Amino acid sequence: MSDFWIHLLVYLVILFGFVIVSVLIFIWLERRLIGRFQLRPGPNRAGPFGLLQPIADAIKVLIKEDIIPSEADKGVFWLAPLVAFVPVMLMFAAIPFADGVMLVDLNIGILYILAVSSVTVIGIFMAGWSSNNKYSLLGAMRTIAQEVSYEIPLVLSILGVVMLTGSLSMNEIVKAQDVPFILLQPLGFFVYLSAAMAEVNRTPFDLLEAESEIIAGFHTEYSGMKFGLFYLMEYAEVLAVSAIATTLFLGGWQGPLLHPVFWFIAKILLVFMFIIWVRATLPRLRIDQVMAFGWKFLLPLSLANLVITAFEILIAPDINTAVLIGINIAVMFGLVLLFSRFYKLGGGRVSIK
C-alpha cells in the first residue's frame, strides 16, 4: 500500500473520531446549557458534571431492539439512515482545520460541500415515506419544503464571500481573510446562519420533529442503531454548519499565539453555543411563518447583500477598512429593521403591512 493511501486512511479515521467525539461533547454541552437557561442542573449523574451521560445514552441506543414496522418498505427503511448520514461525513473532506490540514483541497470546495449536503434530504424523505406512517411522511414533506426554501438564501449568502475572494477553495477563502469576513459581510453572516439553522432543523425551525404536532417527525418509527444514526446525523450537521461558518466568516484557523487547530475548534464552539442560545430563547415557528421568513425576509436580504458586496469590490480600494466595516454593520442593522417593519410574523397568517 502506497504512502498516499496510508495517509488517507489515517486521516479518515482521525476525522471520523473527531466528528464522533465532537457530537458527544455537543450533546453534553447543549443539555447542560439548556439546563442552566431553564434554571435546572441538567445531566449530572453519569460521571463528573454528567460528562459520561452522552456515552451512557449511546450505549443505551446501541443495545435497544431494532424494530421495523410490518407495513414499512423494509429495504428503503433500512437504507434511509445511511443515505442521510454518509453525505454529512463527506462534507468534512473539504473543510480545513488548519492551513492544508484537510482530506482534499478542492478548488471547488464550497460548491462540493453545497452539493453533498443536499443529498441528506433524500435520506430523510426515504425514511418518512418508507415508514408508512402519516406523521413520518408529514415530517419528511416539511423537510423538503424547508430545504428548498432556505437553500437559495444560503447559497446567495456564501456567494458574497466568493465574490470577495475570487475562489471556491475553502483553504484560499481562509487565507484571504486579513479581516474576518463577518465584519465585511455581517449581513451575509446573518443570512447564512439563519438559513443554515433552518437547513439543519434547529429551533426555531425544527418543524420536521415538532413533538407537539407530529410526534418525532420522519424518524417516529425508528429505534436502536438506525435511530442513533439519525441522531448522530443531526448533530454532525450542526458541527458541519458551525465549521463552515468559521471557515467563511470567522477567519477559520487564524488567530494569535495558540495552535491553529485550537482556534478553529474554539470558533466552532462559539457558533454552536450561539445556536444553543437561540434554541433556549425563541419559540418554534409555524410552518407558514417559516416559509415566509425564508422567501420574504432572507431571500431579499441575501440579494441585497450581493449588491452591497459588488459596491464594496468597486469602491473598497478608496475607503479605509474601519470605515467600511462600520458602514457594513450599519447597513445590516438598517436593512434588517426595514424588512422587519414590512413583514410581521405575529398572530394569524403572515401578511404584508
Swiss-Prot record:
Gene Ontology cellular component terms for the protein in this record: plasma membrane
Cellular localisation: Cell membrane
One of the GO biological process terms: aerobic respiration
PROSITE patterns (alphabetical): COMPLEX1_ND1_1 (PS00667)
Keyword flag Phosphoprotein: no
Entry's transmembrane regions: 8-28, 75-95, 108-128, 148-168, 179-199, 229-249, 258-278, 297-317, 319-339
Location, primary (coarse class): membrane
Catalytic activity: a quinone + NADH + 5 H(+)(in) = a quinol + NAD(+) + 4 H(+)(out)
Enzyme Commission number, as recorded: 7.1.1.-
Example of a GO MF term: NADH dehydrogenase activity
Keywords annotated in UniProt: Cell membrane, Membrane, NAD, Quinone, Translocase, Transmembrane, Transmembrane helix, Ubiquinone
Membrane topology: Multi-pass membrane protein
Domain of life of the organism encoding this protein: Bacteria
InterPro entries: NADH_UbQ_OxRdtase_su1/FPO, NADH_UbQ_OxRdtase_su1_CS
Entry-linked Pfam families: NADHdh (PF00146)
Family of this protein: Belongs to the complex I subunit 1 family.
Subunit text: NDH-1 is composed of 14 different subunits. Subunits NuoA, H, J, K, L, M, N constitute the membrane sector of the complex.
PANTHER family associated with the record: NADH DEHYDROGENASE SUBUNIT 1, NADH-UBIQUINONE OXIDOREDUCTASE CHAIN 1
Job description of the protein: NDH-1 shuttles electrons from NADH, via FMN and iron-sulfur (Fe-S) centers, to quinones in the respiratory chain. The immediate electron acceptor for the enzyme in this species is believed to be ubiquinone. Couples the redox reaction to proton translocation (for every two electrons transferred, four hydrogen ions are translocated across the cytoplasmic membrane), and thus conserves the redox energy in a proton gradient. This subunit may bind ubiquinone.
Protein name (Swiss-Prot/TrEMBL): NADH-quinone oxidoreductase subunit H
Species for this entry: Dehalococcoides mccartyi (strain CBDB1)
